[in-house]
Amino acid sequence: MVKTMKCKFCDKKSYIKLKSPKMYLCKEHFVEYFENKVKKSIDKYKMLSKDEKILVAVSGGKDGHAAAWVLKKLGYNIELFHINLGIEGFSEESLKAVKELAEKLEVPLHVVNLKDITGKTMEDIRGKKCSICGTTKRYLMNKFGYENGFDVIVTGHNLDDEVSFILNNLFNWNIRYLAKHEPVLPAHDKFLKKVKIFFEIEEELILKYAEAEEIPYTTVECKYAERAITLKHRAYLNELEKERPGIKYQFLSGYMKNRHLFKVEEEDFQFRECEVCGMTSAGKICSFCRVWKLYKKKKENRN
């Protein structure tokens, strides 16, 4: 007969077994534990304040949705931002989940359609789409946030994402990325402050929180996602986590303590305004306008 484990803090049946710290928790005490963990992380890194106007990026998946949910419960002033990328099947399901989330949270939802801005969808892009998609999402959410008076952008990147990212950049010795990897990116010119409230939270815990709170999200994945290397990294890290519970967090903590070792001296760099859209750019034309060839449209409109 299998023994039913009880919650550490009450007599209810356990909902989850935490590996680090080792304890069983019922659904109610797990939700309390999770939300306190997020609050501590926000306070630790001075991520957010209650008077800030916060734009939460939601793609339809559990991480962004859980981020919005917990911030609303903690009393922050949030609104949701979603980009319809025009990917058959995926975009429809994502938008449906996002609308349901906004309705449950009773917060404003802002939806931007990629085709309305570029005249194209991600389906129209040939070859590898992921890097262009990343550039597109970062640009559009920052531009929308800047033009609509938001103070900060929150994304749902979690501990597993961060550790995998750091590991990948260590393998490739991308020093510049390693030097700038932070839970909070400060505002600069037209770049809004960006925050990762799940920087220290495992993906597994986010999933269990989403299930416990019955947060609406879609499990449909993008058919173009390039995840081969990332999945291998995660599988390796998950095996290590089984053998040494807490190793992911220890790895991230070690990186945060020693990230100054990756700092490199850089020449004084002056950002400028993109000649096409006017947003902050490293060059004459920003990466978004360049990849979507919007500079060509501007020339055509002049003629």
From Swiss-Prot:
GO terms for biological process: tRNA wobble position uridine thiolation. Belongs to the TtcA family. TtuA subfamily. Signal peptide: none annotated. InterPro entries: Ncs6/Tuc1/Ctu1 (IPR000541), Rhodanese-like_dom (IPR001763), Rossmann-like_a/b/a_fold (IPR014729), TilS/TtcA_N (IPR011063), tRNA_thiolation_TtcA_Ctu1 (IPR035107), TtuA-like_LIM_N (IPR054306), UPF0021_CS (IPR020554). Catalyzes the ATP-dependent 2-thiolation of 5-methyluridine residue at position 54 in the T loop of tRNAs, leading to 5-methyl-2-thiouridine (m(5)s(2)U or s(2)T). This modification allows thermal stabilization of tRNAs in thermophilic microorganisms, and is required for cell growth at high temperatures. In TtuA from T.thermophilus, the sulfur inserted into the nucleoside comes from the C-terminal thiocarboxylate of TtuB, but there is no TtuB ortholog in M.jannaschii. The thiolation reaction likely consists of two steps: a first activation step by ATP to form an adenylated intermediate of the target base of tRNA, and a second nucleophilic substitution step of the sulfur (S) atom supplied by the hydrosulfide attached to the Fe-S cluster. It catalyses: 5-methyluridine(54) in tRNA + hydrogen sulfide + ATP = 5-methyl-2-thiouridine(54) in tRNA + AMP + diphosphate. SUPFAM superfamilies: Adenine nucleotide alpha hydrolases-like. The keyword Magnesium applies. The keyword Transmembrane does not apply. [4Fe-4S] cluster binds at C130, C133, C222. Its cofactor is [4Fe-4S] cluster; Mg(2+). ATP binds at A57, I83, K137, G156. Keywords: 4Fe-4S, ATP-binding, Iron, Iron-sulfur, Magnesium, Metal-binding, Nucleotide-binding, RNA-binding, Transferase, tRNA processing, tRNA-binding, Zinc. This is tRNA-5-methyluridine(54) 2-sulfurtransferase. PROSITE patterns: UPF0021. Homodimer.
